[in-house]
Amino acid sequence: PFVFRGIRDYTSNDSLKNVNWKATARTGNLCVNEYNESVSRNVCILLNLEDDGMLTYDSVNEEAISLAASVAEEFIRQGINVSLISNACDVDTKEAVGIREGAGVGHLGSINTVLARMDLKLEKEEFAELINRTFIENVSVQSSDNSVYVVISASRRKKLQQTMQKFEKKYGQVIWIVPYMTGGEYSLDYCGIRPEGWEVK
């Protein structure tokens, strides 16, 4: 069994599944838990901007987009391939945005352009359905031990949690970051994924 040894700064040889998000948020630097030596070279950002059926705060969605950009920038800086899938739509094409995996400054620019062109007023596909269609029910998509999936979603609907539980069983290495307003909560009661709260002040 692996033993937890502490927290230190991230290096390009670390596995992304060992990122300590709370320490990263606190210090401003990407930090990892020391205990696992496997290496992940691909990260897929799954950005959900659907309403939760409750009060919707523009600041939470804006923070989620900003967080996606920051996550992409940090991983690309470390030489890791990054892809992005979202249910938000492009302002002109009116279609859900996405970008295939890639690395380098040019790829980061493409990701930032895609994020900047999102029109949050356009109707969005339910994220659970998007994940089902794109991954779980798509036999051509193979699971990879070399990938980490970073979910950024303030919505914590029961159906979405149950879908992500199936996703984790098939693909593994899922990190769920929940942007939430100060005084709110970010628990995931319908799946076994441990949430990382991201407070929006």
Features from the language model and the residues they span:
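Intrinsically disordered, low-complexity linkers and stems that provide flexible hinges
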Residues: 1-8
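Exposed, interaction-prone extracellular/peripheral surfaces
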Residues: 9-201
